[in-house]
Curated annotation (Swiss-Prot):
This is Uridylate kinase. It catalyses: UMP + ATP = UDP + ADP. GO terms for molecular function: ATP binding; UMP kinase activity. The keyword NAD does not apply. ATP binds at K18, L19, S20, G21, G61, R65, T168, Y174, D177. The gene is pyrH. Gene3D superfamilies: Acetylglutamate kinase-like (3.40.1160.10).
Length: 247
């Protein structure tokens, strides 16, 4: 169930959490690790327990990637549609994990899938969020050529989220890949234009520009660090904050 976390007040009232599909694999090379799902459901439940409204977007890279399928010779639109369906599978798995923990959740898909998910409707999504349900946005934007990062930023803007939280395998944005370059330095704060000018690869160009144009703060943090998600939401200095004025 949604855990009550005493003594910690949230900095954000409504968040959009972006999880990569790869994060669901755990130590596996493909698919979904149920233990990872359960841990993520527990961490999301902690947020619900302190009154935070949570929207979720999950990638599909643990199952299919449209761009990779296209590179292998498949029609790009077909590949992207397969990638969208992969995000729906991940969303259903996450909803199941949340509901098993007695955390109310709903999947809203950008592609109509009657009997499987609800169809995305902004006004309905807002109502579900206000009643404390976790809303999982699936199937990206519903259009090919757009990443799930772009979908996350779009949904965050639509639902008037306070921040986009991008969960990654590193604790922020670095000057280079910290797994490959031991001298890579971490940024505490950045502006959108600095991310674009330095080609830091936090998100794709469309996603960053969406956040910049609508002044949507973005924080990149390490979801694998225990308690990091809760710490971010209560105002802790986790990861890297990207916003209009980084002074």
């Amino acid at each position: 169930m949604a855990q009550q976390t005493s003594g910690r007040q949230p900095r954000y009232k409504r968040i959009l959490l972006k999880l990569s599909g790869e994060a669901l694999m755990g130590s596996e090379d493909f698919g979904i690790d149920p233990k990872v799902l359960d841990r993520m459901a527990l961490e999301v439940g902690q947020l619900v327990g302190i009154g935070v409204q949570v929207g979720l977007v999950i990638g599909g890279g643990n199952l299919f990637r449209g761009a990779a399928l296209s590179a292998a010779g498949m029609d790009r639109v077909t590949g992207d549609h397969m990638g969208m369906l992969a995000t729906v599978m991940n969303a259903l798995a996450m909803r199941d994990a949340l509901e098993r923990s007695n955390i109310p959740a709903i999947v809203m898909s950008a592609i109509s899938m009657v009997g499987v998910t609800d169809h995305y409707d902004r006004r309905k999504a807002m109502r579900h969020l206000k009643t404390g349900e976790v809303v999982i946005f699936a199937a990206g934007t519903g259009n090919p050529f757009f990443t799930t990062d772009s979908a996350a930023c779009l949904r965050a803007i639509e639902i008037d989220a306070d921040v986009v939280l991008k969960a990654t395998k590193v604790d922020g944005v670095y000057t280079a890949d910290p797994f490959k370059d031991p001298h890579a330095e971490k940024f505490e704060r950045l502006t959108y234009d600095e991310v674009l000018d330095r080609k830091l690869g936090v998100m794709d160009l469309t996603a960053i520009c969406l956040c910049r144009d609508h002044n949507m703060p973005l924080r990149v943090f390490n979801m694998n660090k225990p308690g990091a998600l809760l710490n971010v939401v209560v105002g802790g200095a986790e990861g890297t904050l990207i916003e209009e004025d980084a002074q």
